[in-house]
C-alpha cells in the first residue's frame, strides 16, 4: 500500500514535508487564476515524481481564497518543483491576478531548501517537526 514506512527520529532534507500556500485572488480574476493554476498543475504532474500530492482547493466560506496543498518526498523534490518553468511562470503571473500569497511548511527542511524558499520572494513560515512519522 505504501512505498515505504518511515519512522522519523531524524528530521531534515531527506524527510517528507507538507506545504500549504494560501492565495487571495482578485475578484475579477478568478477564472484567469484558475486557468493559470490548471496549466501549472498539469505541468507539475507531468514532470515531478517527488511531488506526492498537489491540489488547488477553494475556501468554502470565501470564493476568492484558494490553497495549494502539496506533499513533497524530500527537499530535492521541492527544489526540482521550483525549477519547473511552469512554476516560474506561475510565480510571475501571480501578482497580476491575486492580492495575497503566504506559504506554511509543515516538516523540517534543510538549509539549501530554506535558501531556495527565500529566493521566491513569497512570505513563508516553517513549522519544524519535533516528533512523528510519515507514510508518504
Language model regions located:
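Short, Lys/Arg-enriched N-terminal segments with co-localized hydrophobic residues
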Residues: 1-7
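Short beta-strand/turn micro-motifs at beta-sheet edges
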Residues: 7-12, 54-58
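An amphipathic, aromatic/His-enriched active-site/gating alpha helix that lines ligand/cofactor pockets
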Residues: 12, 43-52, 71-128
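Active-site-flanking beta-strand signature of metal-NTP-handling nucleotidyl enzymes
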Residues: 16-24
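Short, surface-exposed ligand-recognition loops at beta-strand->loop->(often short) alpha-helix junctions
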Residues: 25-34
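Short amphipathic alpha-helical/adjacent loop interface patches that line ligand
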Residues: 37, 41
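A short beta-turn/loop motif at secondary-structure boundaries
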Residues: 57-63, 95-98
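Long, compositionally biased terminal regions
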Residues: 119, 135-136
Amino acid at each position: 500500500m505504501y512505498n515505504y514506512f518511515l519512522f522519523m527520529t531524524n528530521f531534515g532534507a531527506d524527510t517528507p514535508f507538507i506545504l500549504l500556500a494560501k492565495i487571495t485572488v482578485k475578484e475579477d480574476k478568478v477564472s484567469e487564476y484558475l486557468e493559470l493554476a490548471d496549466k501549472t498543475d498539469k505541468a507539475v504532474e507531468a514532470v515531478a515524481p517527488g511531488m506526492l500530492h498537489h491540489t488547488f482547493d477553494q475556501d468554502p466560506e470565501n470564493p476568492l481564497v484558494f490553497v495549494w496543498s502539496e506533499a513533497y518526498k524530500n527537499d530535492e523534490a521541492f527544489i526540482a518543483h521550483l525549477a519547473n518553468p511552469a512554476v516560474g511562470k506561475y510565480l510571475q503571473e501571480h501578482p497580476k491576478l491575486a492580492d495575497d500569497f503566504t506559504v506554511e511548511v509543515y516538516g523540517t527542511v534543510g538549509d539549501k531548501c530554506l535558501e531556495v524558499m527565500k529566493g521566491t520572494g513569497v512570505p513563508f513560515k516553517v513549522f519544524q517537526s519535533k516528533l512523528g512519522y510519515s507514510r508518504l
